From Swiss-Prot:
It comes from Bacillus subtilis (strain 168). It is found in: Cell membrane. Keywords: Cell membrane, Membrane, Transmembrane, Transmembrane helix. It is a multi-pass membrane protein. This is UPF0716 protein YtzA. One of its GO terms (cellular component) is plasma membrane. Pfam families: FxsA. Belongs to the UPF0716 (FxsA) family. The chain crosses the membrane at residues 3-22, 26-46, 70-90, 93-115. InterPro entries: FxsA.
Amino acid sequence: MRFLFLLFIVFPAIEIGIFLFLGNLIGILPTVLFMILTGIIGAAAAKKQGTEVYYKVQRDLQYGKMPGEAIADGLCIFIGGLLLMLPGFLSDLAGACLLIPFTRGWCKPILFKWLRGMSKNKRIIIK
């Protein structure tokens, strides 16, 4: 329940505050253009990296390897691309962290821990 409160009340309020602050600091037009630009860059980066991960999964499967790492990368890229396309500066920061391979390495253990927790709680079943 606290997570939903943060997601739907606190997070948008912080985003609106950042919009207002930057709108006053650099102006409305640059702020809006920056949001549009991050959405376009996010979509392009997610498409490029997503295609690379797709080929990596195929290659791993051809060699008989489990593509777990590549699938985790793909999930991070997908979520990162979505976050970059959402309007907001915090979501852009989180999305960029998921798209940059160096910082994605920090996020993947959190993703794996969350998935293991979901599996243990029987919320998702991994077979």
